[in-house]
């Protein structure tokens, strides 16, 4: 007992000395104590005495004042406090388009050009290496205001999924590589009775097929997305909804519709209710091709291994579509293809945007460079530390208490009881001073995606910041786009009407949005 008591005293003494040495080092490097107000992403209120709040305060010689905001009303709540004259030193901008409104209100500080590289070098290095196109995304009028948070997993495009058993039945041995090969296969699926029931009841494709054909012309259109997507044509940025190549896409798809190759129910989509990612048209054997949902919704049972809480590997559960297929038609075989090459040499398919949010400094920090430097140092330390143990600790809690490594190579952790049932516990204890970074994902599911080249030939928007008037016109323009797609494919509008549609689209606000997009692109995109 005496020995254990001595060990406990020694352990406590060592902990005190360690904290003292950290505090001394902080005072030496950061001589002046600074108070910082910070608005992070959080789903639970942060305790001002949370262990990781205190760790950072000691390490960087700061007092941290965390503003707890309801994430469902995040930007609105921040705006209300700003309207009352309270401007935080550092804050998250939940919706990227709101960068413009904060700029109009003059509540953001300009970040000197070399500050990110100098005072947040690991953030800068990660962005430069993995998402260089976003380094300028937080610029307005040529000045940097926002630090971009970029999704690491939106590097994966939509899947191209084919009925492999149907392909075999109609004599096709490999998935299509070109749009011409795709068209040939779709006709076979519709005309050669691939299910062998003697009925004319199959189709090649339905609504998600629009994304595959548009992608073959370099156009990112996906009716599941409600965001504006832009493409670069020459030196200009134009909305994908009026890209000139779209006229050829619609002419081709009208031909398929007229010939009975495209499911006439494409208007209502492939999902008949329930979980959004399910393609009931594919599951129930109505169509032979789908890009509905994300790649992981189509992974079969055992497609990759998962690590259990005991550290053992076991086959993964099936994705949502794969699970339903196993219940409805367990003999069905499907396979994955590459994005199609079109007649103009382009190849691709829709990919969800990677730009998620921004972080910005309050206007008052513009006059306090020391505070800006200190905030960047904390942000860099928590977001992009080269030590994976440290990074995961400042984002998930104390290793051994809150979580443990299951598979460090694949960056898989196990949250320990009782924290495994406490959503947002890490925010409560102060693991909120970071943003999501585009480090290449290493988890086993993403390893499966790399193996199947889901990271190849995705087309994301050429501009993801949004434009000042985007919110004013977005709903109207999106409705026009969706109505146009249906009208041209079904033949309610002749293809000759396309040029008139473009004029009407531009008149309805599209021209203003396009001008703002080009103004931003020319003013804020720099050569590196």
Residue ranges and their predicted role:
Residues 2-5, 9-13, 17, 21, ...:
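Extracytoplasmic/secretory soluble proteins
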